[in-house]
Amino acid sequence: MPHVSRKEYSSLFGPTVGDKIRLGNTELFIEIEKDLRGYGDESVYGGGKSLRDGMGANNNLTRDNGVLDLVITNVTIIDACLGVIKADVGIKDGKISGIGKSGNPNTMDGVTPTMVVGASTDAISGEHLILTAAGIDTHIHLISPQQAYHALSNGVTTFFGGGIGPTDGSNGTTVTAGPWNIRQMLRSFESLPLNVGLLGKGNACGYGPLEEQIIAGAAGLKVHEDWGATASALRYALRIADKMDIQVAVHTDSLNEGGYVEDTIDAFEGRTVHTFHTEGAGGGHAPDIIKVASLMNVLPSSTNPTLPFGINSQAELFDMIMICHNLNPNVPADVAFAESRVRPETIAAENVLQDMGVISMFSSDSQAMGRVGENWLRLIQTANAMKVARGKLPEDAAGNDNFRVLRYVAKITINPAIAQGVSHVIGSIEVGKMADLVLWDPRFFGAKPKMVIKGGMISWSTMGDSNASLPTTQPITYRPMFGAMGKTMNDTCVTFVSQASLEDGVREKAGLDRNVIAVKNCRNVSKQDLVRNNNMPNIDVDPETFAVKVDGVHATCKPVDIAAMNQLYFFG
């Protein structure tokens, strides 16, 4: 049997088991753990390559016989559930139909039965690329529709949040309030190439106002301090959530007016809740909201303004808070409110707790202190900053950072999907799930995706001058592709609602053309279900110094002055 050198093999088919890949200009290195393809029969598209008629492409089977619509060949997969593996990925009917070996079973050994290539199949060459599940951002202030395009440009295809545009309420709270607003926002998203789940206003000490929003199309509720995050409001929201199987997100009481963090924990009554700001710079009980990350029933996330913790974080946060929450810098009480939320000690601890897998999710807080187009970027920057500051994780192998990278990838893919009740549809690269996928050049991993696949079609991509002789002619910019055009979006995008809303006919009542799918299993999940991020240590906060101790050890880090993939990667 002929042999080729590892270097030559890599140039032809990309890396394989034992090969390592550096992510961007970070200190993070992944190593391929498993190869599902089989050597010698690789599927490759191109002149003189194997995916030709009668060779790697079957010339008898039709699409109805199971032939793929699209295959991504020889790609390196980074997925929180699968690990770091090498495989072909097959897509059919907008869903992932196979992960393994693609090709023609008449001429190739070991072809995965659901991954036959034929005349109905197109191909993306993934030999020198990385594939991840698309990002899910669960903390979206719907202030401007243009957020969608910035999110896609950083590999995010799903929004959970609320708002109706640049109202002061939307600027400060992720809430779409009331049935009329909910229906109009669902209709607006018909023209945006993203999945969406809206959060209704959970601040009501009565079941009627909450239930009508859930039936109208809200996929969850948000209890926010700006509308009054009282213990009573939390109890009502959580009780209706238990009844209707939706998630409740909470931004707790920074001023401790209605009670302290212990009172809020008591109000949870052991029920599942998604804590949005598990560190208080974005809001929440001052100074110790971070303690809730140790609880089994709390699904904790935090947002990208403080991740990674940088030398300018403290300075920029004050102005952010003043603007987002309708505060006046000439009013001493408003200034004191803003200052109470910016604590370098707890911000540093937030970074450490993310690295330890204690805070489980990573979101943006779009245009309301956070940057919607930087979620993957900040995620990988934080992972790198923590490796530099804290060294290797105990779970990592000696020669790679696979566990750390997978822990962070889980924070933006499968864990938000689990928390919001959509992991049966999106969140990981698994057979049967919607093909919401992102292809990355390893040199730009986390910073700039090469291509975004939405529901099995390319919806967003780098693209050169459309009047040029090649697709790679500069200037290369992000542009919408055919998957983001016309009626195709009805098939490639999903609107998430409650089961009660689906049964009430929200699709017909709101005049929606897109796929409408119900969230589920929101109430029977716990911290233990979150992938690679389910640690629950004891957390204490010193009320005077704000120092955070995790199992008695001071959790802190220095602010970074130089972040990976920062100015070197972005001009202007």
Curated annotation (Swiss-Prot):
GO BP term (any one): urea catabolic process
Gene responsible for this protein: ureC
Lineage: Bacteria, Pseudomonadati, Pseudomonadota, Gammaproteobacteria, Enterobacterales
Post-translational modifications: Carboxylation allows a single lysine to coordinate two nickel ions.
GO cellular component: cytoplasm
Entry protein name: Urease subunit alpha
Residue span, Urease domain: 134-572
N6-carboxylysine, modified sites: K222
Spans through the membrane: none
Coiled coil: none
Entry binding sites for Ni(2+) 1: H139, H141, K222, D365
UniProt keyword Cytoplasm, yes or no: yes
Complexes and interactors: Heterotrimer of UreA (gamma), UreB (beta) and UreC (alpha) subunits. Three heterotrimers associate to form the active enzyme.
Keywords on record: Cytoplasm, Hydrolase, Metal-binding, Nickel
Organism the protein comes from: Edwardsiella ictaluri (strain 93-146)
